[in-house]
């Protein structure tokens, strides 16, 4: 068998398997985030601990609570048109509820459950939510304050705050006060329609001394029940360096100086604190007892002015609050490239007003950009197809002499200007594009509950009738049928014929938006191949005509 063709096969198979690996890894090896009903039974304030600015090995002692904490009660409620925020008696954000319709769709069923329901005569009895809670009931709450002094800390956790108002709306000021005898804590909060807020922490004491303390942005949201993306703590410092601590990876206390924002995230939502001070703040990452999930704290020694946000990781909303907050949207190793892809996709959405059509336009743009390379690759494959008979003759002639066969093959390629790997280059370049689009479409909360046409009512979940995956497989097979076949080994041909089936199987549970991209990509590739085949055929005829003349 021709060594170059063999290498060609291996390269293409490696690329194909790279795509399939995404599906396999996500489906079989990553665990979804636990739901709010699956959270631990331990009380957060009794079990979570943080480090102090000065302590190093006394984590289990610093900022801990040794006394029993009474069940916190509701202190204040801030109501918005599409959300509601509750403040508890310990001066923390108890819960954030989203009321926007796009976030209230029922949980997506698993593949087998969905198929079973699809062929069942029973109607879907799963009701939509009335409101979506973002925070776990028994996890670390945003705006919780802890002191280094254990006596003061325990007193703080057993002394309720008083509030200036019990009900208020956006842009109204809420003052929370806690009287600890010789020390009073005053939290001044202003919440806005976009769910970001301003926070001022002040103290009153006879000697004007401020004890060392920390404040937290809280445990990550748990609203996304089927997360196969990054979840944990993400922060950025003044050098624009981003640090990530994933769930189950918080094994020791970590300190990060000059931090600009501290965020805890799941697939679609975040709770964060940030500063406008160019010097930043010191962030401390602790580990939740039992799970080793990261818990974020800000270490403070003085009064503080901070800002926060709890809500969807919507690109435009975060950018409007502060451009640096768009870095909260995490795309993995190719974030720098994926973010550019999303910006282009978002621009196209603003132009057409539909995410499905925006994805199709994005695919067209990608194909146009890659066309010159695709053309060269297809020309090279066509030349290899024409050389197939001569290649077979050489294989028969130099059977058992691989070195001579290789040398004569290279001479043949050079003589006719053919490149055995030329057809793979466009496919190789599509790898980062595919991964970027995969990460964008899987992470973009903007696509949640976004309709396209007919049966596609949500581009963020799998096609309910599997029509797009089947079309994708058919279009991939169609593309194979119009692409020049340069393989001389029957086994190679059989393996390639299986690729459409494998892609269909492993992409069947992927978000409809991603499958729409791949289907459109295949159809455009077919059209492009037909055009190039026609161009090459015309050139071949013209060349033959010139020889006759």
From Swiss-Prot:
Residues 37-56 are annotated as: Disordered. Residues 37-51 have a biased composition (Low complexity). InterPro entries: Membr_insert_YidC (IPR019998), Membr_insert_YidC_N (IPR028053), YidC/ALB3/OXA1/COX18 (IPR001708), YidC/Oxa/ALB_C (IPR028055), YidC_ALB_C (IPR047196), YidC_periplasmic_sf (IPR038221). It comes from the Bacteria. It is a multi-pass membrane protein. The keyword ATP-binding does not apply. One of its GO terms (cellular component) is plasma membrane. Interacts with the Sec translocase complex via SecD. Specifically interacts with transmembrane segments of nascent integral membrane proteins during membrane integration. Belongs to the OXA1/ALB3/YidC family. Type 1 subfamily. This is Membrane protein insertase YidC. It comes from Helicobacter pylori (strain J99 / ATCC 700824) (Campylobacter pylori J99).
């Amino acid at each position: 068998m021709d060594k170059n063709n063999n290498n060609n096969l291996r390269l293409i198979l490696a690329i194909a398997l790279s795509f399939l690996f995404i599906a396999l890894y996500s489906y079989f090896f990553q665990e979804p985030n636990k739901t709010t009903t699956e959270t631990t039974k331990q009380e957060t304030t009794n079990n979570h601990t943080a480090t102090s600015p000065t302590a190093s090995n006394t984590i289990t002692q610093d900022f801990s609570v040794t006394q029993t904490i009474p069940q916190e009660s509701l202190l204040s409620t801030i109501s918005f048109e599409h959300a509601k925020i509750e403040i508890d008696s310990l001066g923390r954000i108890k819960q954030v509820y989203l009321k926007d319709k796009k976030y209230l769709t029922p949980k997506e069923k698993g593949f087998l459950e969905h198929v079973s329901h699809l062929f069942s005569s029973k109607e879907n009895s799963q009701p939509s939510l009335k409101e979506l809670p973002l925070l776990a009931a028994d996890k670390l709450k945003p705006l919780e304050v802890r002191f280094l002094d254990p006596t003061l800390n325990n007193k703080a956790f057993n002394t309720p705050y008083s509030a200036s108002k019990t009900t208020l709306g956006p842009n109204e000021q809420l003052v929370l006060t806690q009287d600890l005898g010789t020390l009073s804590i005053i939290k001044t909060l202003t919440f806005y329609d976009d769910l970001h807020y301003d926070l001022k922490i002040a103290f009153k004491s006879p000697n004007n001394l401020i004890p060392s303390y920390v404040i937290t942005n809280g445990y990550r949201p748990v609203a996304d029940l089927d997360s196969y993306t990054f979840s944990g703590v993400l922060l950025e410092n003044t050098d624009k360096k981003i640090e990530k601590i994933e769930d189950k990876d918080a094994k020791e206390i970590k300190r990060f100086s000059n931090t600009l924002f501290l965020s805890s995230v799941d697939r679609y939502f975040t709770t964060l604190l940030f500063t406008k001070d160019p010097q930043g703040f010191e962030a401390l990452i602790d580990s939740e007892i039992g799970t080793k999930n990261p818990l974020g704290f800000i270490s403070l020694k003085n009064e503080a002015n901070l800002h926060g946000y709890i809500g969807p990781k919507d690109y435009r909303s975060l950018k409007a609050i502060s451009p640096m907050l768009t870095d909260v949207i995490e795309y993995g190793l190719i974030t720098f490239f994926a973010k550019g892809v999303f910006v282009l996709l978002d621009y196209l959405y603003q132009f057409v007003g539909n995410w499905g059509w925006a994805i199709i336009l994005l695919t067209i743009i990608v194909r146009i950009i890659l066309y010159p390379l695709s053309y060269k690759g297809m020309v090279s494959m066509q030349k290899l197809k024409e050389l197939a008979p001569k290649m077979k003759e050489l294989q028969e002639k130099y059977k058992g002499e691989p070195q001579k066969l290789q040398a004569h093959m290279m001479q043949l390629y050079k003589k006719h200007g053919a490149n055995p790997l030329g057809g793979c280059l466009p496919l190789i370049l599509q790898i980062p594009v595919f991964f970027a689009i995969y990460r964008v479409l899987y992470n973009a909360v903007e696509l949640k509950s976004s309709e396209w046409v007919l049966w596609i009512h949500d581009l963020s979940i799998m096609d309910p009738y599997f029509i797009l995956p089947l079309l994708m497989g058919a279009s991939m097979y169609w593309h194979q049928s119009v692409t020049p076949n340069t393989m001389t080994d029957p086994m190679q041909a059989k393996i390639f014929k299986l690729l459409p089936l494998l892609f269909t199987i492993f992409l069947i549970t992927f978000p409809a938006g991603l499958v729409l991209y791949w289907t459109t990509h295949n159809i455009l590739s077919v059209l492009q191949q037909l055009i190039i085949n026609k161009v090459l055929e015309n050139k071949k005829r013209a060349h033959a005509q010139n020889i006759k003349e």
